Amino acid sequence: TDMLAVSVSSTDAIGHKYGT
């Protein structure tokens, strides 16, 4: 739910979901 939490938790998920 939290973007920050997901970012810190899973960088791969962030790259795939947010494309960062």
Curated annotation (Swiss-Prot):
Source organism of the structure: Prevotella intermedia
Catalytic activity: a phosphate monoester + H2O = an alcohol + phosphate
Key words of the record: Disulfide bond, Hydrolase
Lineage per the UniProt record: Bacteria, Pseudomonadati, Bacteroidota, Bacteroidia, Bacteroidales
EC number: 3.1.3.1
Ways its activity is controlled: Completely inhibited by thiol-reducing agents, such as DTT and 2-mercaptoethanol. Activity was also inhibited by sodium orthovanadate, sodium molybdate, N-ethylmaleimide, EDTA and zinc ion, but was not inhibited by okadaic acid.
PTM field: The N-terminus is blocked.
Gene Ontology molecular function, alphabetical: alkaline phosphatase activity; protein tyrosine phosphatase activity
TM annotation in the entry: none
Enzyme class: hydrolase
Subunit and partners: Homodimer; may be disulfide-linked.
UniProt-recorded name of the protein: Alkaline phosphatase
UniProt region (Disordered), positions on chain: 1-20
Any single biological process term in GO: peptidyl-tyrosine dephosphorylation
Protein function: Acts against tyrosine-phosphatases.
Cysteines engaged in disulfide bonds, as pairs: none
